[in-house]
Amino acid sequence: MNVAAGGPGTASASTTAANSIFNNSLLASATGATTMPMAQLADGWLELESDPGLFTLLLEDFGCHDVQVEEVYDLQKPIESPYGFIFLFRWIEERRARRKIVETTAEIFVKDEEAISSIFFAQQVVPNSCATHALLSVLLNCNENNLQLGDTLSRLKVHTKGMSPENKGLAIGNTPELACAHNSHAIPQARRRLERTGAGVASCRFTGEAFHFVSFVPISGQLFELDGLKPYPMNHGGWEDHEDWTDKFRRVMAERLGIATGEQDIRFNLMAVVPDRRIAITHKLKMLRTNQAIVSGTLQKLLKADEQGESGNGDQQRPDTPTTLLEPSAFTAKDLQLLLKNLDTEIAINEQNLADENDRRHMFKVDASRRTHNYDKFICTFLSMLAHQGVLGELVSQHLLPSKKVSGQSAANRISKQNSAASSAGANAGAAAGVTPKSQQQQQQPQTAASKNGKSPGKTPGRRRKGRNKCRKRK
């Protein structure tokens, strides 16, 4: 599913020009890299598809390696420790359901400047950048200590603190590291579409059907909705003491989808930004292997103590040998063996889960290579080789035949094959029974006439003469 961002809420050309000088000087300190105007960034910002693998690799390119993105298929299914949610929906300005949503969300706008500056809320002033905006809205509002943002995002968060939403959007749009990482995951068709339209900052508008990303994140005990095409962030309120913030999010999404689908269907996609599953699995494996070593060592000591007791050498035990775990009241050898077996099973399961996650991450990269590779040269070369060999015209004519004609020919071919098979089967059966088929009798008649003309004896001519004699007697 392609994403087309821009349109309503984008900055005008005059606003962008007025802020270009300020924006370039700002980013020199914000990113620590040589900056350039948006018009000089390679090809501008391109459309991205809504794919969790793409978003995960995009986060890695941003420098954030401890996070992944997962697609959510069931809102009722619990999700472990999400940082935030990204909601992709179809944007149609003229639709009634859209107006209902606007009327509903207008009541929860946060217009206090101090409250807005305390969070990371950036207006989308660059077309096709809503995917990056959605990811940054989740990550830069996360207060988790174990979340490593990386150098680029950390500098961006520090140097844009206290800025207006519009200036934050300009900072995102003119950060070369973000733009290059974003465009590296675009399909070749997106680049060609941008070249045909020549879309700029102010010229890219929503036309027909477009898709847009928004973020839902918990901030200071409140559920916020951050949409770069809205003038203000939206506060959906808090949640109960016995609830998790995801419960509040489920209620908001159920209400949102109920309004949007009241008159016609709406296509949407929901993704969750969560910690990298491999980190938790690796930590669990480390703990399980430590416990496995402890249980295995205790079991060996217990078995050794039993052997020494049976041989009468128990008094030779070293005084410094720990005996706490060897007491009968702790664990028996059978209990330790059962515990060790359970640990082995858990380790095998988690090793398989870790292998699956690594394979999944590898497939993300394979899919990204296939998605971003330009196959135009290969296709042109392949067609040229077919034409050079003289088979291209025949292949094209075969595939251009009407489907009915092809199906009729196929049916005729099937009937002809069935008749041939039936004839051969009948011939074989007749030969086995000593009966000559009718078709073979007709073929043998010329040979019979030839034998008659040659006056060779045969049963058939004798029968014919006998019949003629009977006719003469009747006369």
From Swiss-Prot:
The keyword Protease applies. Residues 404-475 are annotated as: Positively charged C-terminal tail required for binding nucleosomes. SUPFAM superfamilies: Cysteine proteinases. It holds the Pfam family Peptidase_C12. The active site is at residues 130, 212. Residues 44-275 form the UCH catalytic domain. Residues 461-475 have a biased composition (Basic residues). The record marks 227 as: Important for enzyme activity. Keywords: Chromatin regulator, Coiled coil, Hydrolase, Nucleus, Protease, Thiol protease, Ubl conjugation pathway. The record marks 124 as: Transition state stabilizer. It is found in: Nucleus. Its main location: nucleus. Residues 374-402 form the ULD domain. GO terms for cellular component: chromatin; cytoplasm; PR-DUB complex. Residues 411-475 are annotated as: Disordered. Residues 333-360 form a coiled coil. Gene3D superfamilies: 1.20.58.860, Peptidase C12, ubiquitin carboxyl-terminal hydrolase. Its EC number is 3.4.19.12. Belongs to the peptidase C12 family. BAP1 subfamily. Catalytic component of the polycomb repressive deubiquitinase (PR-DUB) complex, at least composed of caly/calypso, Asx and sba (MBD5/6 homolog). The PR-DUB complex associates with nucleosomes to mediate deubiquitination of histone H2AK118ub1 substrates; the association requires the positively charged C-terminal tail of caly, probably due to direct binding of DNA. Interacts (via ULD domain) with Asx (via DEUBAD domain); the interaction produces a stable heterodimer with a composite binding site for ubiquitin. Catalytic component of the polycomb repressive deubiquitinase (PR-DUB) complex, a complex that specifically mediates deubiquitination of histone H2A monoubiquitinated at 'Lys-119' (H2AK118ub1). Mediates bisymmetric organization of the PR-DUB complex and is involved in association with nucleosomes to mediate deubiquitination. Does not deubiquitinate monoubiquitinated histone H2B. Required to maintain the transcriptionally repressive state of homeotic genes throughout development. The PR-DUB complex has weak or no activity toward 'Lys-48'- and 'Lys-63'-linked polyubiquitin chains. This is Ubiquitin carboxyl-terminal hydrolase calypso. It comes from Drosophila persimilis (Fruit fly). The gene is caly.
